[in-house]
């Protein structure tokens, strides 16, 4: 069986080897059948370590203003430098104000200091920062693919749990802590134990108004929020191959809610078409060479995974969460289960057996690294056009990047949202998490395209129902949790 093994690598990758436009390098060898994950892992092993761990080469590092300055300042205080600034990027996204006319001021107390310190630290280290007013500013997991920073076969890390989003491009991408970011910037490597492998196959064709968000919530509801623990998950099957790149990013984004190390999808012609011409992607002869490598990344047909899960995509329905974990989700036309934990019911203000559809809501949010891309906004706008949201409802739309915002405005989507009664904002993480400063009213019940429905996630004592952009738009119009299939 033809497979891969890593070419010899230096323990200190240079800009030429792993810079802003480089790609991982493999050479063909005979070995056991391999998965996509196995190929990328083996290609990046610098050396095996004691205790069953490996020293892995890291191709891309992304920082944000909440923790980036701390990692860079700690590095400087230790007398160390960033080994290769060309492969490190930073962005202001987590705590920036998303209201129109924003400045460095933030709703988070002391937030401006994080932004100021990030500017100074990245400037001193020679790192490219996508700052508040930069035309490429946006949520890290939105702008990295937009700019072609993430590439098939690459390793990419960031101090954010949803870094797995970028596995949609056939990359090995995962979230880390600040101390790991510091180590990776100084050495170009990280010490890791190889996780197990899992393949989740979605067979068949998705029904109308059923989205990648619904696929992810269905998986987590059936197999638990810890179902992917200790594994790198590859998503496969007819329904996955049919997704566009933005849909694939949504699916991989939710892998961390499944407790997986990462989520991945093998690159194909859709992947390559997306990346072609992107700023940090290879070009010219390097592009052709990269394509030749990328086309050989897919898992071997007879590759063995440690665990397999199969789901009939054709039987899925729009999903919505009812509790305080993504695993507590059900079809929109379903009910709160009879065995729901009483503590969760007391917090969320629902009773077991109650129908989800028709549950009154106070607010609606469209945004986050899960569902803030152009296709997400188009889907929501298709339901909102010519309609008005329910009276008294607060509704907010936050594009995932400045580029998404510009493209949406060029299509007139901003007018559709505004005329329907939504606020139209600047790009950023915004209402995804209360710690960023932006929030809904205390105790508000919100239907949201975000990825987490933990207690007080979007405001003090708030209740969050996570769903797709279509379900959020339909619910905003109805003033209660609603089925988008009944409005489309």
Regions found by a protein language model. Give the residues of each.
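C-terminal alpha-helix plus adjacent terminal tail
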Residues: 1-28
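Fe-S-dependent hydro-lyases/dehydratases of central metabolism
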Residues: 29-488
